[in-house]
UniProtKB/Swiss-Prot annotation:
Membership in a protein family: Belongs to the universal ribosomal protein uL15 family.
Positions of the UniProt region annotated as Disordered: 1-64
Keywords linked to the UniProt accession: Ribonucleoprotein, Ribosomal protein, RNA-binding, rRNA-binding
GO function terms (MF aspect): rRNA binding; structural constituent of ribosome
Entry keyword annotation includes Ribonucleoprotein: yes
Entry protein name: Large ribosomal subunit protein uL15
Lineage: Bacteria, Pseudomonadati, Campylobacterota, Epsilonproteobacteria, Campylobacterales
Any single Gene Ontology cellular-component annotation: cytosolic large ribosomal subunit
Record organism: Helicobacter pylori (strain G27)
Function summary: Binds to the 23S rRNA.
Quaternary structure and interacting proteins, as annotated: Part of the 50S ribosomal subunit.
Length: 133
């Protein structure tokens, strides 16, 4: 096998696309850029997210993810939850284990008719019952 028999691997060498070199080439006149307009001009680059005048996707979708800077209080109805009544001591961690509320919650308010009766069991200052401030 000599050097004269060497060939590049199939598909590794592509033919150069010469544009704007006459109509006979099939890529003359507009040089594969289509008609007139902004996209036919040199230096044109669309902004990220630009959809040709259509309302962009990021403006069509609703805004999400806002969290207020005010304190986050989680309310628990005692009448609907028997497990709270059975606790000996009501602490923030014991309520979190029962309810799995998010980490950004700073306090818990126990509401319902029986909430005031549980005030003696509360051992955490982050927990209030209805009627307390």
């Amino acid at each position: 096998m000599g050097l004269e028999n060497l060939k590049p691997a199939k598909g590794s060498v592509k033919k150069i696309k010469r544009v704007g070199r006459g109509q006979g080439s099939g890529m003359g006149k507009t040089a594969t850029r289509g008609g007139k307009g902004q996209t036919a001009r040199t230096g044109y680059k669309a902004k990220r997210g630009f959809e040709g005048g259509q309302q962009p996707l990021q403006r069509r979708l609703p805004k999400i993810g806002f969290r207020t800077k005010d304190s986050h209080i989680y309310s628990i109805n005692v009448e609907k939850n028997e497990a709270i009544k059975n606790l000996e001591e009501i602490t923030f961690s014991s309520l979190r284990a029962l309810h799995h509320f998010p980490l950004y919650i700073e306090g818990v308010k126990l509401i319902g008719k029986d909430a005031k009766n549980l005030a003696s069991k509360i051992k955490d200052e982050r927990i209030k019952t209805s009627g307390q401030k």
